[in-house]
From Swiss-Prot:
Comment on protein domains: The MREI motif is common among all beta-tubulin isoforms and may be critical for tubulin autoregulation.
Organ and tissue specificity: Nervous system specific.
Species classification: Eukaryota, Metazoa, Chordata, Craniata, Vertebrata
Protein name: Tubulin beta-2 chain
Family: Belongs to the tubulin family.
Gene expressing this chain: tubb2
Alphabetical list of Pfam families matching this protein: Tubulin, Tubulin_C
Amino acid sequence: MREIVHLQAGQCGNQIGAKFWEVISDEHGIDPTGSYHGDSDLQLERINVYYNEATGNKFVPRAILVDLEPGTMDSVRSGPFGQIFRPDNFVFGQSGAGNNWAKGHYTEGAELVDSVLDVVRKESESCDCLQGFQLTHSLGGGTGSGMGTLLISKIREEYPDRIMNTFSVMPSPKVSDTVVEPYNATLSVHQLVENTDETYCIDNEALYDICFRTLKLTTPTYGDLNHLVSATMSGVTTCLRFPGQLNADLRKLAVNMVPFPRLHFFMPGFAPLTSRGSQQYRALTVPELTQQMFDSKNMMAACDPRHGRYLTVAAIFRGRMSMKEVDEQMLNVQNKSSSYFVEWIPNNVKTAVCDIPPRGLKMSATFIGNSTAIQELFKRISEQFTAMFRRKAFLHWYTGEGMDEMEFTEAESNMNDLVSEYQQYQDATADEQGEFEEEEDEA
């Protein structure tokens, strides 16, 4: 089997990671003790991707939980599925990173990283044929962003030919924990551009807007935001966990989705959007699902896809539905809004259907888009970064941990390069040959 080793780092990473394991354990019929109580062979057919089968028919998640302070991991351990994880896979420090990327990446995190890598090796060795790693973390804090990116680069060194996939929560001024989020996020993106194969950009701003506008929650909590994240994560991993043809492993997904190695930041979406209480009231049709899924209000990244163009798209439909109808609707979207898909990648929309719907829904759709509009998210962080960096505000916290201002400048320019690369491919057309000839004539 093709296994995936899951890592979760920092407070946010551990909270959404724990939620992810709750949701997929439920979908695979696994209870909090690791015993199987399912009703379908499909649940077990590819269970090995995320779970290790231990003695006594117990299923143990291939998960490694990392943090620089014990708090969040204690609450995961005492949470609903806390006992399902392998106790040795909790790796934590005592000092905390204090929302400081440098502490996570260079000082505190660097001290803990070797003991994490030991656990990574142990998990990898129990795999038959490891396909890659996935990390859940946020980019605004200290541990998830600083130590998370340190782990990525260390794992990359040791397993250079395995896929590295991240679920990265982007900071937002609307749901802000700390004032230095733009610094931490920029330093992290600088690492993610170079060291990951696919990154799902989950944006607190978008999650907040969905809760507020669509779900009519007046004061969304992190619990509400994480409910959306876990639905999305369950959706994008469907193809990896259940039998199917399309994007059945991380590498195939990357091959379909990433036309240029640096442009691997995906915009996830989900339909139907429901709040935690109101799922069962009406079933959606395939046309409604498709329409909702492409709607900017359903995107988990605060970018408007209509401001850019799609390089590639993958859609995953779940539930009992007619393949024919799904294909018709997807073609319909591409024909109606063809200007939003780059014409120099033909057939750049791929669709998969899985029979098993998520808990509480008859059918759902998950959207993964590689859109040039994602640059809006990086621009937003970059502007906040520049505003503070110009005045060197809060910089002493980072230089005090041994960082150099030069590193900030490099991260800033790498992020700006990323934005202009997206812009370049947004403007590119299939008949560029003609434009160059015209320029020569003028010369």
